[in-house]
Amino acid sequence: MDNIPYFLATVLIFSLGFRIEEGMCQHYYLLRPIPSDSLPIVELKEDPDPVLDPKERDLNETELRAILGSHFEQNFMSINPPEDKHAGQDELNESELMKQRPNGIMPKEIKAMEFDIQHGKKHKPSKKLRRRLQLWLWSYTFCPVVHTWQDLGNRFWPRYLKVGSCYNKRSCSVPEGMVCKPPKSSHLTVLRWRCVQRKGGLKCAWIPVQYPVISECKCSCPN
């Protein structure tokens, strides 16, 4: 879809202005649903003692793949440092963001939206123009999940996971005020090296754990 001329964006803002009061976030509910809670951020706290690290004999790929089984997801996991590990939100510019068009069914709030052209005499836009404005608004309020590779350290296997974050370099609403936030997460199952002190000494083993990752971003109030 070609870029909408500036006056069309102005038309959109004036049209929405009758429905949305700038600075009052509750009025933005017409555009996007608000998540009921926030996604907790995982903070890994590890004892730095190298005695607790897995040894080379504990990192047999064949054995670890057998333990992890079908939970190994090659699109989101890597044993070796990924080549594009630095590709993430910092490198994603506005033009690249707009290329990540939303797909699926247009939100009913946007599909039902009407627009008034404030250019001379007030009148309704054509069906084609209305459709272009709806697509522009849908694309502008779309919140993509930006993926980057994260190194979990040598006490996790696979060591590298592709995790998500929400694009937040600009507001996702018209007028401005709302931001992209994660409403929910999914989980990846990985192996964690766990050591426990027993009577006979230190006992260590790989155990399966679930690691939460952001799977969706939505336009919502900042607080």
From Swiss-Prot:
GO BP field: cartilage development; cloaca development; determination of left/right symmetry; dorsal/ventral pattern formation; embryonic viscerocranium morphogenesis; negative regulation of BMP signaling pathway; negative regulation of cell differentiation; osteoblast differentiation
Pfam families assigned to the protein according to its UniProt record, in alphabetical order: Noggin
Subcellular location: Secreted
NAD is among the record's keywords: no
Family from the record: Belongs to the noggin family.
PANTHER family: BONE MORPHOGENETIC PROTEIN INHIBITOR, NOGGIN, NOGGIN
Function: May function as an inhibitor of bone morphogenetic proteins (BMP) signaling during later stages of development including late phases of dorsoventral patterning, to refine the early pattern set up by the interaction of chordino and BMP2/4. Not involved in organizer function or early phases of dorsoventral pattern formation.
Protein name according to UniProt: Noggin-3
Name of the gene encoding the protein in the UniProt record: nog3
